[in-house]
Structures are given as structure tokens and as C-alpha cells.
């Protein structure tokens, strides 16, 4: 008799404009409150700027703006989900993030044809654990890494300039 094991993955769960999203926890380094964002001139609209986190300057991407939602002021609930994607550390600004959950593979469905266009490529799957619906993001598609090197170079110059002025 063969026993079938139900494999599950762990996800960081966050909300954005009233919708629940998940990212694979192995891509997340930490979740933190946002104290200060330094704007970077000529950055793409979704790049809020850079933040200093654990001794590093990292780009901060506003997922509301990236997904075409209304930009809202940051508040006490706003979090930054710090990710490591292809060797680059990037902060994702979300409305709220406080939860790690394990989701069985059998409750994650591939996105169907109803989810199409640009937003469709951002969605890796749709999870339905219990009575919840969680959109699982494909971070490689969500974060356009071609924008990030410019931001990293600009932020390094700004940090050097600030240090030289001291």
C-alpha cells in the first residue's frame, strides 16, 4: 500500500488594497516597520527610494504602485517585506504583513485564463486554505530587476556623499 504525502510550502502572507497575497518564505529575509525612506531622483514610479536596513542600503518597491493601486500614506500598519531575489536584497512595501503559514500543495491552483494580461504573469498560483483566497506571487515577474541596478548605483553614491559630508 503506497502512502501519498501531502507536501506543503511556507509563505509570508500580506495584504495590499484589501487583497491577500503570499510569497515563498525562502525568498523572505525579514519583515519590518518602515522608519525612513530616502527618495532617489529619476527612479521608476514604483521605487519609493532606498532604506537602511541591518547595515545595508536597499531599494524599496511600493507594491501598491507596482500593481496600479492608489498610493496611500505609510502608517503604523505598513510593513516592508525584505526579500532576496537572484542575489539582490529588495524591500517590498505592503499594507500589512504579520503571518507565516504553511499551505498544502493541493490547495494551490495555477491561475486560470480569467487572470490574463500583465497582472496574470505576476500570479504564480491561487491558494484556498480554509475559506481564504491567497494570490501567490511570482516575485521574478513582480520585480523588474533591470530597474534595480540603477537604484543601487544611485543609492551607493548618495551614501558616499552623505558620509563625505560628515
Question: What residue ranges belong to the model's regions?
Answer:
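An acidic, low-aromatic, low-complexity terminal/linker signal
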Residues: 1-166
